[in-house]
Regions:
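A membrane-topology feature that recognizes alpha-helical transmembrane segments
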Residues: 1-167
Length: 167
């Protein structure tokens, strides 16, 4: 029990610090495009600190409790960027490719490394299948709602599906 608690607590503290940094970075509104500059400012987003801390801490505690450290490169990129993506999406209803693309790349590399380092190729393949299924499901919603679900949402669903499929 203690072996899972200590990494979880340490990661929670690191996540809180990263959450403070993310919140301050997003407060500059540098992610906004030219046509989004006139939108109202979103105000203070203290929830970013808590979600960063809890997501990183809970994933680290789970990885330690299950000894599934091979999945860390698959799960951590989304945990680290998820709060920022949520804040940006809530503000401008857009998920920037400059965040999604590296997260997708690291997640795919994480799936490949999981297959090589002991997580097994079945884990990597199920992660890829999860990403394809989630991406395809949201692509269907995009087509059915005529763009009500955006392309960024489809990309994010594929990343989440890959991470969830690997677990």
């Amino acid at each position: 029990m203690l072996t899972a608690l200590l990494p979880g607590l340490a990661a929670t503290a690191i996540g809180a610090v990263l959450g403070i940094w993310t919140s301050r970075t997003l407060a500059t509104l540098n992610y906004r495009l030219d046509d989004e500059q006139d939108l109202p400012k979103p105000g203070r987003r203290w929830w970013i600190i808590w979600t960063s801390a809890l997501s990183l801490g809970s994933i680290a505690a789970w990885l330690a409790a299950t000894s599934s450290w091979a999945l860390a490169p698959v799960l951590l990129p989304l945990a680290l960027t998820g709060p920022a993506l949520a804040a940006i999406d809530l503000d401008v209803m857009r998920l920037p490719n400059r965040i999604l693309a590296p997260v997708a790349a690291v997640t795919i590399l994480g799936l490949a490394s999981t297959g090589v380092t002991g997580g097994g190729w079945a884990t990597a393949v199920s992660g890829l299948i999860g990403g394809l299924v989630a991406g395809a499901a949201l692509m269907m919603l995009n087509l059915l709602t005529r763009g009500g679900v955006g392309i960024g949402d489809i990309k994010l669903a594929a990343i989440i599906g890959s991470a969830a499929g690997a677990v």
